[in-house]
């Protein structure tokens, strides 16, 4: 029988950051308070990622200051999620790299944890009480080449050792001078005129467009800075010192944008005035070649890294409760759901029931189904399906750290999964007209028996409309007509507003359906998802989820309790 079914849940259950948290973008910076749906942020993989959902401002939530080993402090709510490694997972990763992770205690890897969970396990339960959680550095920003008036290396050399008010470079090293002359020989106009045009003459700083150049261009810029004013420590770390605070901040951003952890220290020096009496020293570690100047590159190689510093990640050194502040949630469209936050560019985190419907229809009962996914990519959906069917942790699949037992389970399920009549369409900006046309073709071609749309709030009509509520109402009516025309169930995933969070019991109601009351009116069935342990980690019903059948046009309403196995991307019946 055909039916129009709405499945609704809260978006992310409140993974929120303070409104003033800086967020890097492909063109500069924004904040959690200013970012809007459709804007681009940067993911942990260094690539631009689009904001697909952003909540209203949330008040009265328990908040924490999360402090990292490089001095970065981020204010987040208790439910905000971080992808962290623990002492156990770091040992497991080392075992995996060495090829002997065959034991259960060597199969724990990085996992998503809330701020509250990290606060409770901040230090290891060992005699030395060492720090437990670390966050792996983001990859170097992956951005396109730009056209620059001043070549990046030349700008870096001038910023490091040039006269602020003129185009004079005081470096005596002939290798640097020869490279600058070679770069400027093919340009028209003087270096001084070009420095004035980009706004740095008399005001030393790195223009934003240079900080968002390609990785190669940013490495050339940093090489110019280090060749003129960089040093190497006894342990092989790279240092850059300057008394210009703005330039120090810009160079720190440049270093972080290349995927390195940057530590900043200060000390008093004898300067001409107060503003030049503080020296800022930036320190970072890498095995890569950072100097273009041959003698410095050789010197760094000679002072090889001692290997005692964990330079690929930041440790969380403290998680302390603070007074509640206004916070906001952001959701991005990349597969890992990670985006960068703060000036240090720390990676931070951001639907399972719809996939359970598909698995039951196509894999268990061999009937054709289709999901039109506006949120997740095809590869992400397939990975979640494999995780759920083979009962393998999604985090292990993503990281490529599956055990021999995991591979065996996956191999056993692959033939059945690969033969399932399951169709996935992750086309961007799908309209209702396109969904109807594709669903009709599948009905004729493969005897389609189920349609899932994930999710309604990401759909667009492609037309100018008077209000978003009217647009969602039209989607609701069109889905109803589609279900009736094809005579198949149409399951539409929807978001709830933040109403449940204001109630004592946190349970969702029909009135919480987001952006349109038409969803409630048009649907034959509405299922609301509720997870008691989403707000209270120590809730006695931890691990349970409620499917609240809030509307059923042709039958009774009821609440069904199931077990959530989110690490396996699935819900399961409760054990009896």
Swiss-Prot record:
Matching InterPro entries: DNA_helicase_DnaB-like_C (IPR007694), Hint_dom_sf (IPR036844), Homing_endonucl (IPR027434), INTEIN (IPR006142), Intein_endonuc_central (IPR004042), LAGLIDADG_dom (IPR004860), P-loop_NTPase (IPR027417)
Record key words, sorted: ATP-binding, Autocatalytic cleavage, DNA replication, DNA-binding, Helicase, Hydrolase, Isomerase, Nucleotide-binding, Primosome, Protein splicing
Reaction it catalyzes: Couples ATP hydrolysis with the unwinding of duplex DNA at the replication fork by translocating in the 5'-3' direction. This creates two antiparallel DNA single strands (ssDNA). The leading ssDNA polymer is the template for DNA polymerase III holoenzyme which synthesizes a continuous strand; ATP + H2O = ADP + phosphate + H(+)
EC code(s) of this entry: 5.6.2.3, 3.1.-.-
Keyword Hydrolase: yes
Any one GO biological process: DNA replication, synthesis of primer
GO CC terms of this entry: cytosol; primosome complex
PTM characteristics: This protein undergoes a protein self splicing that involves a post-translational excision of the intervening region (intein) followed by peptide ligation.
Keyword Isomerase included in the entry's annotation: yes
Residue span(s) of domain SF4 helicase: 313-576
Pfam families: DnaB_C (PF03796), LAGLIDADG_3 (PF14528)
Single Gene Ontology MF annotation: ATP binding
Subunit and interaction comment: Homohexamer.
Family that this chain belongs to: Belongs to the helicase family. DnaB subfamily.
Function description: The main replicative DNA helicase, it participates in initiation and elongation during chromosome replication. Travels ahead of the DNA replisome, separating dsDNA into templates for DNA synthesis. A processive ATP-dependent 5'-3' DNA helicase it has DNA-dependent ATPase activity.
Protein name: Replicative DNA helicase DnaB
The organism of origin for this protein: Mycobacterium intracellulare
Gene coding for it: dnaB
């Amino acid at each position: 029988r055909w039916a129009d079914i709405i499945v609704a849940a809260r978006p992310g259950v409140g993974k929120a950051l303070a409104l003033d948290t800086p967020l890097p973008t492909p063109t500069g910076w924004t904040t959690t308070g200013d970012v809007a749906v459709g804007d681009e942020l940067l993911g942990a993989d260094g690539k631009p990622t689009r904001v697909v959902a952003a909540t209203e401002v949330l008040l009265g939530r328990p908040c924490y200051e999360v402090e990292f080993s490089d001095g970065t402090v981020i204010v987040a709510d208790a439910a905000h999620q971080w992808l962290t490694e623990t002492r156990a997972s770091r040992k497991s990763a080392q075992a995996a790299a060495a090829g002997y992770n065959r034991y259960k205690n060597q199969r724990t890897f990085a996992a998503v944890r809330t701020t509250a969970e990290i606060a409770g396990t901040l230090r290891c339960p060992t005699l030395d009480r060492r720090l437990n959680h670390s966050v792996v550095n983001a990859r170097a920003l992956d951005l396109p080449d730009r056209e620059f008036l001043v070549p990046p290396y030349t700008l870096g050399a001038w910023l490091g050792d040039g006269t602020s008010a003129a185009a004079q470079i005081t470096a005596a090293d002939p290798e640097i001078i020869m490279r600058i002359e070679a770069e400027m020989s093919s340009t028209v106009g003087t270096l001084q005129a070009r420095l004035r045009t980009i706004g740095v003459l008399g005001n030393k700083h790195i223009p934003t467009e240079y900080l968002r150049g390609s990785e190669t261009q940013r490495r050339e810029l940093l090489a110019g800075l280090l060749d003129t004013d960089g040093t190497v420590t006894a342990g092989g770390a790279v240092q850059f010192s300057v008394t210009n605070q703005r330039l120090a901040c810009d160079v720190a951003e440049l270093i972080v944008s290349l995927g390195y952890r940057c530590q900043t220290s200060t000390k008093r020096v004898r300067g001409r005035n107060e503003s030049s009496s503080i020296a800022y020293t930036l320190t970072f570690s890498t095995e890569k070649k950072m100097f273009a100047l041959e003698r410095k590159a050789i010197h760094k190689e000679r002072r090889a890294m001692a290997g005692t510093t964990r330079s690929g990640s930041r440790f969380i050194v403290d998680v302390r409760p603070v007074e509640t502040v206004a916070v906001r949630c952001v959701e991005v469209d990349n597969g890992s759901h990670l985006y960068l936050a703060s000036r240090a560019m720390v990676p931070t985190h951001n639907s399972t029931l719809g996939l359970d419907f598909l698995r039951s229809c196509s894999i268990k009962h061999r009937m054709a189904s289709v999901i039109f996914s506006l949120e997740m990519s095809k590869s992400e959906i397939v990975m979640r399906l494999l995780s759920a069917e083979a009962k393998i942790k999604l985090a292990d699949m993503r990281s490529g750290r599956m055990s021999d037992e995991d591979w065996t389970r996956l191999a056993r399920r692959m033939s059945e999964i690969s033969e399932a009549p399951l169709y996935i369409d992750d086309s961007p900006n799908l309209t209702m007209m396109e969904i109807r046309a594709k669903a009709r073709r599948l009905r004729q071609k493969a005897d389609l028996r189920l349609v899932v749309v994930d999710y309604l709030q990401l759909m667009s009509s492609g037309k100018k409309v008077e209000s978003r509520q009217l647009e969602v109402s039209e989607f609701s009516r069109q889905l109803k007509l589609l279900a009736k025309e094809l005579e198949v169930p149409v399951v539409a995933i929807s978001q709830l507003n933040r109403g449940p969070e204001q109630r004592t019991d946190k349970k969702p109601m029909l009135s919480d359906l987001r952006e349109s009351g038409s969803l409630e009116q048009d649907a034959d069935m509405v299922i609301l998802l509720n997870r008691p342990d989403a707000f209270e980690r120590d809730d006695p019903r931890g691990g349970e989820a409620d499917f609240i059948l809030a509307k059923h046009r042709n039958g009774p309403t009821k609440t069904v309790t199931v077990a959530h196995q989110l690490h396996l991307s699935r819900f399961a019946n409760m054990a009896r």
